[in-house]
Every structure is written in structure tokens, then in C-alpha cells.
């Protein structure tokens, strides 16, 4: 189940990958049976792909699975897919990728990935036909409606989906519904952010006490990994390990994996609820009828709830939304440079309280 995500590798003072330390992580994982290695064009400013190619060259190519992702941020009318893809092959020192993903299919990237003039999917399907891509999939941090729309239109070409799933986002970001959507389509799921960028590895004292009462031998991160690993349709659980301590703890969890009991599932659900100082919105949408500003109030409260929990969450996990609404409903999430103009604040204030 365990896969290595090469996005948070140990680094040196200048920010480049500490290849000696990172190489030891790869070797330890490989020698203990981990055979799925995930990278992307942009990880570590492009150095991650190069590092993995170097670190894995000593091992038989058919003894591990290599996954990477398209550089979606570079795609424009002048984009050269041939040059970008061949660069990835060179970086990774391979002539094929076992798994290749459209990187972060979401609301803001959907127009690019589906633009018929850019022919992104057409090129990747050609590479698959040539044997340079074994399995084609997507990763996504997008919202459920977008994922439903994309899979309905393009799902016939997709063989697997990589989703952000953890016991907090199971309800907070509708990970449960996304999981069920992909499962119902008969596609396997690869999990990313099982510890939500590390936030589920550092819990409050009371939550840790409850965990230790049930399983004193387990670390706090182990609970997060066991949650996603217990889901029947999860094929790989990615972990962005950056230290040998994390590697050893994960190997302990997965080499003798135990699915969550009902009691343990209930505990994680309680902990997730306790972590969210949120507005208990059920998305009934009755309030929207009375909103003079025609705001999507449930959606904005969802943004607020997520930002309230993770005010410093990494950019890749942010829910994209118009800056002024984020600033209005989650002050402090963005810098003061994005504060509302006075006229905008007054315009919003004129519509307040009617709902």
C-alpha cells in the first residue's frame, strides 16, 4: 500500500535536494518492499524527477513503478508537449512511465486540460499507444461537481485517480463523496495528503491521549495512514517522507497493516469534529434565496471552515476562490495586500443580514 511521494525531500541550506539523505530514504523503502515512487515536473523546482532517476537507476526497471505528472502550469498556445515529455523521460532516466497523471485537475486548470486547440489528452494518448505511458490518470484537489463533470466527459480515457483523502477532509472537503464517485466508476484510487500536509501528525494533547489509550504502540501519523489504508478501493497511499524516522514509522505501519476497527473509526471521526471550529452549514441553500448579493453562501462557508482550520496550508491544497470573498469570510488567510477596497466592503455590507 505504501508509496513514496518525492515532494518533500530533505534539502540543503540552499534549498536543493540533499541527495545523500534522500537517497538513503529511497534505498530503505525499496529494500523493504516499497515499489511505487511518485514525482512531478514541478516538485523541488524540477529537481525531484532528476533525483528519482538517479536514485532508482541501480535497481531493475521492472522492479518498481514510476509515476510523474504533466506540467500543467506551462501549458499555453506556445507549449511544446514533445519537449516537455521528453525532458521528463531524460530526467527520470527511463523510456516509459508506469503511471502518468494530468496534474491537479481542478476548476482553474480545467479549461487548459480540456481546450481542444491545446490537445493535451491527444498527445498523452499517443504516448500511451507508443508504450511511453503504461497507465494514464489524473490527480485532483478540485471540488466534487468539477470532478463529476470531468469524469463524465473524459473518464473513458482515465485509468486511475489520485485524490486528497484523510480523516479530516473525509467530511470537510467531501473526500468521502469523491472516493465514492471514483469507486462507483470502477477506478482505483491513489491517496495523497493522508496526513494533510503534516497537520494530522501534530494533534492536541487530549486527542493524542485518546489514541494512545487504544493503541499505545502506534504513532499519531499511523492513525492517519491506517484510516486511508482501510478504505477498500485505495491501491496506494503516498507519503512525502523527508526523514528516516518517518520512513521507519511508515514501514512499521504498513508492513504489518491493521485495518481500523469500528471503535477506532469513531474516535477519528470525533477528533476530526473537535478540530474544526466551524460554521455548521448543511448546504440546504435556503439562505441563498434572501441574499441580495447573490452569494454562494454554503460555498463561502466551506472556504471559511477550511481556512479556519488551516490558515497556513500549502498552496497546492488551497481551495481556489475569488480573493475578495476569501478575505471577507476568512480574514488573515491571505495577506493584507488583498484586503477589500472600501467600495467593495460597503457593497457587501449593504446586503448583509437579509439571510
Q: Would you name each region that the model predicts?
A:
Residues 1-64, 123, 129:
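N-terminal binding-site loop/beta-alpha segment at the start of enzyme catalytic domains
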Amino acid at each position: 500500500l505504501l508509496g513514496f511521494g518525492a515532494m518533500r525531500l530533505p534539502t540543503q541550506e540552499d534549498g536543493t535536494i540533499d541527495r545523500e539523505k534522500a537517497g538513503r530514504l529511497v534505498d530503505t523503502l525499496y529494500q523493504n518492499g516499497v515499489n511505487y515512487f511518485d514525482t512531478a515536473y514541478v516538485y523541488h523546482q524540477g529537481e525531484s524527477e532528476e533525483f528519482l532517476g538517479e536514485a532508482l537507476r541501480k535497481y531493475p526497471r521492472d522492479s518498481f513503478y514510476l509515476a510523474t505528472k504533466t506540467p500543467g502550469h506551462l501549458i499555453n498556445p506556445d507549449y511544446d508537449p514533445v519537449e516537455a515529455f521528453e525532458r521528463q523521460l531524460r530526467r527520470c532516466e527511463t523510456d516509459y512511465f508506469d503511471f502518468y497523471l494530468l496534474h491537479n485537475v481542478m476548476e482553474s486548470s480545467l479549461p487548459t486540460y480540456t481546450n481542444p486547440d491545446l490537445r493535451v489528452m491527444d498527445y498523452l494518448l499517443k504516448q500511451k499507444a507508443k508504450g511511453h505511458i503504461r497507465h494514464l490518470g489524473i490527480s485532483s484537489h478540485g471540488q466534487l461537481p468539477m470532478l463529476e463533470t470531468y469524469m463524465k466527459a473524459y473518464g473513458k480515457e482515465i485509468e486511475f485517480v489520485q485524490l486528497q483523502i484523510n480523516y479530516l477532509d473525509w467530511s470537510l472537503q467531501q473526500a468521502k463523496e469523491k472516493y465514492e464517485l471514483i469507486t462507483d466508476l470502477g477506478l482505483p484510487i491513489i491517496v495523497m495528503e493522508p496526513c494533510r500536509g503534516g497537520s494530522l501528525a501534530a494533534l492536541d494533547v487530549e486527542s493524542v491521549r485518546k489514541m494512545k489509550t487504544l493503541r499505545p504502540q502506534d504513532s499519531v501519523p499511523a492513525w492517519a495512514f491506517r484510516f486511508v489504508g482501510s478504505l477498500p478501493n485505495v491501491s496506494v497511499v503516498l507519503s512525502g517522507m523527508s526523514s528516516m524516522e518517518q520512513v521507519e514509522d511508515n514501514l512499521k505501519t504498513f508492513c504489518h497493516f491493521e485495518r481500523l476497527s469500528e471503535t477506532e473509526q469513531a474516535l477519528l471521526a470525533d477528533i476530526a469534529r473537535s478540530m474544526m471550529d466551524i460554521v455548521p452549514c448543511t448546504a440546504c441553500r435556503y439562505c441563498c434565496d434572501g441574499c441580495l448579493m447573490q452569494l454562494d453562501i454554503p460555498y463561502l462557508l466551506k472556504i471559511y471552515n477550511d481556512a479556519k482550520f488551516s490558515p497556513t496550508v500549502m498552496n497546492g491544497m488551497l481551495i481556489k476562490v475569488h480573493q475578495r470573498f476569501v478575505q471577507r469570510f476568512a480574514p488573515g488567510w491571505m495577506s493584507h495586500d488583498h484586503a477589500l477596497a472600501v467600495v467593495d466592503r460597503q457593497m457587501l455590507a449593504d446586503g448583509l443580514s437579509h439571510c
